[in-house]
């Protein structure tokens, strides 16, 4: 349950639903597995795991949701080969080239035949709502995946007035300033990874891993008008992460010292451990998010 990515969204007006009312709303889009002729299914499951039923877990005013997606895997190459074989057979038998609509119909028949035997794969995406501070966070590696979850939530609530966090200064400018200065402000520390992109269209990309970023070599790239588009950072010796120029946070890791604070919770009691971990994680992230935003220059005034 410990988040590995952060996509940050600001409510444009207060989130008015409590856990009980939201629970009822989510019932309209419960997850169920794909039927024999369905390509994908998307819905809500309990964030506390398969042995729990609650769809909204609340701890210290914070809410945790979980969306599950199941998709049938149909290799494109297999479909293409089967379709071409069918087309060749029919064109040879009829002595003419098939029309576009006929080919599309054949493809639908092939999909209809293959779907019941297709292997399903599933993924889960957690969503954290912080009503008191007026934002929500999706544990998704891409904005598209986060948007899918937000769209599902919007279907349940009727409306979801959220927008991505908007900063006064573009993150790439601030990160470039940090690297030029050789240090980040506050409790943030530069680590050993960065991506630098040229401001010019074909100016090149530099990716550094396991490298000291405070060197003349790196400064030379910055002097050549390259901007920092990804930067590995550490916050308060508690959280390490990679910050991107779209304000997305990936490869989020919490320190062992933090995670071990819940070692006294009985591990066999899965729900109790999830509850304790969620409270611990959100307690830390509730401090981390505003400090990061402040270090980056703050949000745009409304």
From Swiss-Prot:
One GO-annotated biological process of the protein: regulation of DNA recombination
Localization (cell): Cytoplasm, Nucleoid
Keywords assigned by UniProt, alphabetized: Cytoplasm, DNA recombination
Any one GO molecular-function label of the UniProt entry: double-stranded DNA binding
Pfam families reported in the protein's UniProt record: RdgC (PF04381)
InterPro entries for the chain: RdgC
Family membership: Belongs to the RdgC family.
Name of the protein: Recombination-associated protein RdgC
Chief place of localization: cytoplasm
Role according to the record: May be involved in recombination.
GO cellular component: bacterial nucleoid; cytoplasm
């Amino acid at each position: 349950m410990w988040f590995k990515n952060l996509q940050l969204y600001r409510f444009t007006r207060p989130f008015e639903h409590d856990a009980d009312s939201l629970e009822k709303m989510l019932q309209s889009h419960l997850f169920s597995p794909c039927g024999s002729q369905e390509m994908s299914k998307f819905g809500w499951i309990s964030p506390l795991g398969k042995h729990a039923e609650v769809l909204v877990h609340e701890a210290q005013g914070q809410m945790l949701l979980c969306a599950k997606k199941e998709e049938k895997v149909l290799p494109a190459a297999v479909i293409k080969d089967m379709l071409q074989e069918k087309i060749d057979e029919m064109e040879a038998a009829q002595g003419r080239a098939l029309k576009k609509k006929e080919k599309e119909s054949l493809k639908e028949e092939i999909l209809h035949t293959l779907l019941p035997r297709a292997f399903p794969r599933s993924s889960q995406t957690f969503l954290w709502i912080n009503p008191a501070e007026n934002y929500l966070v999706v544990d998704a590696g891409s904005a598209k995946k986060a948007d899918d979850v937000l769209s599902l939530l919007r279907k349940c609530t009727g409306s979801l007035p959220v927008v991505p966090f908007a900063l006064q200064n573009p993150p790439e400018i601030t990160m470039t300033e940090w690297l030029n200065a050789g240090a980040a402000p506050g409790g943030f520390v530069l680590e050993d990874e960065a991506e630098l992109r040229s401001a010019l269209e074909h100016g090149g990309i530099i990716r550094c891993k396991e490298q000291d970023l405070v060197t003349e070599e790196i400064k030379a790239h910055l002097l050549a008008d390259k901007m920092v588009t990804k930067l590995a950072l550490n916050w308060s010796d508690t959280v390490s992460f990679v910050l991107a120029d779209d304000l997305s946070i990936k490869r989020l890791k919490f320190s062992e010292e933090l995670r071990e604070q819940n070692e006294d919770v009985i591990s066999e009691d899965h729900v109790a451990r999830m509850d304790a971990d969620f409270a611990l994680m959100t307690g830390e992230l509730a401090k981390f998010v505003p400090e990061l935003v402040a270090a980056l220059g703050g949000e745009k005034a409304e």
